[in-house]
């Protein structure tokens, strides 16, 4: 059994795979090829929410290979009623005791059933993780009671008031301009928050 894991979170192991297919290693070893249903094994493995894809095949020397690709989480959802990961396709991945992924955390005042908020969170995360300036800076998203967003920065002003999703791309452009400005970097310690909520401007609040 081979398990490919891009995020290094290790949600599943070899024994988990055998549990998915309702077999143990001893049942497979020594079995006749004709008695092993490859398509059925793949179907059972891919039914697991942690699995993106699988490939099951026999080599010429009659050795069964099971290759599994895990889903890659991009954000950890910490809703009021539930905690789980979400991948780039919007699929939920349960929290595992086997390992945790180092991804952006989205917490706050929302429930796991609020699809609109989850979609907007994923849109924010996609913008952050695909940008070389933003990715090393933003570590958390907080959802306010009125479902606006606050970004938590690792460096500089910790609180970034993003507001709603209107003009999302433009707000991120302003934020990147802010991060890149040399004069701003020299004065980071003087500010506690940055607001992008107002049209065509950045408003900074001093400590």
Outline where the language-model segments fall:
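Flexible glycine-/small-residue-rich
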Residues: 2-5, 66-72, 97, 107-110, ...
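Periplasmic/extracytosolic POTRA-like scaffold domains at the N-termini of outer-membrane
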Residues: 5-49, 97-123, 163, 173, ...
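Extracytoplasmic
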Residues: 12, 36, 59-63, 80-81, ...
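Short, well-structured beta-strand/strand-turn elements
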Residues: 47-62, 133
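Short beta-strands and strand-coil junctions in structured, solvent-facing domains, enriched
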Residues: 52-53, 63, 72-75, 93-94, ...
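Extracytoplasmic segments of membrane-associated envelope/inner-membrane machinery
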Residues: 66-145
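Extracytoplasmic/luminal low-complexity segments enriched in Pro/Gly and acidic/polar residues
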Residues: 162-207
């Amino acid at each position: 059994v081979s398990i490919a894991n891009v995020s290094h979170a290790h949600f599943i192991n070899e024994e988990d795979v055998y549990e998915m297919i309702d077999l143990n290693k001893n049942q497979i070893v020594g079995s006749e090829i004709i008695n092993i249903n490859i398509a059925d094994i793949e179907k059972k493995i891919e039914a697991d929410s942690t699995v993106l894809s699988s490939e099951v095949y026999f080599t010429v020397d009659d050795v069964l290979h099971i290759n599994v690709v895990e889903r890659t989480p991009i954000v950890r959802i910490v809703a009021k009623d539930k905690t789980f990961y979400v991948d780039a396709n919007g699929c939920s991945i349960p929290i595992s005791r086997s390992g945790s992924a180092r991804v952006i955390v989205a917490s706050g005042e929302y429930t796991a059933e609020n699809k609109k908020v989850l979609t907007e969170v994923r849109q924010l995360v996609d913008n952050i993780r695909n940008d070389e300036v933003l990715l090393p800076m933003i570590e958390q998203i907080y959802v306010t009671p009125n479902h606006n967003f606050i970004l938590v920065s690792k460096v500089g002003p910790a609180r970034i008031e993003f507001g709603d999703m209107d003009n999302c791309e433009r707000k991120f452009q302003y934020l990147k301009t802010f991060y890149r400005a040399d004069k701003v970097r020299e004065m980071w310690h003087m500010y506690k928050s940055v607001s992008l909520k107002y049209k065509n401007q950045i408003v900074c609040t001093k400590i």
